[in-house]
Amino acid sequence: MTELVFILDRSGSMSGLESDTIGGFNSMLAKQKKESGEALVSTVLFDNESAVIHDRLPLEKVPPMTEKDYFTRGCTALLDAVGGAIHHIGNIHKYARREDVPEKTMFIITTDGCENASRRYDYEHVRRMIERQKERYGLEFLFLGANIDAAKEAARFGIGADRAVNYKCDEAGTALNYEVISEAVCSVRAARPLSADWKRRIDEDVQKRGR
């Protein structure tokens, strides 16, 4: 069993990429449903606030994302979204029977801008949470950022540069994002170590086309 937690930016700066984000996410889900093994899916969409549209649903029961779910507005309360999701999933794992805790848990965070609206969590709090989850429970975190220095921003969260990547925030870049995310998820679900070149295709796209 693998637990997948998607934390996706839908702030106003994502305007114009709604259909690309929805299509990329749904394509990724469709591919994952064809893979062997069980998985639970949580999806958090954030702007000024966070909206949980899937809360630990079995993968095969996750409905496609629609424009009623993903619409852009507001600012970027990234820390609140990440902190809230870790707190929620962490508490469930803490109080679950050992046999009910997924073997692997993976958080995938995408944003096209810096934090600017959180009220409940700050960087230090979230960094401590992430470092604790990685060290004690082996959780995996990926950070995909556009229009920012993704490695530098991820480091403030306690996420290493090897798990962070800058992407091109346009139609092609968004589609590639979800292809690469799907490949990374496949590796984790198959209990294979996530290789250092998981982000190679995104890096090459940015080198070719720029940020």
Where do the PLM segments sit?
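Acidic, low-complexity intrinsically disordered regions
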Residues: 1-211
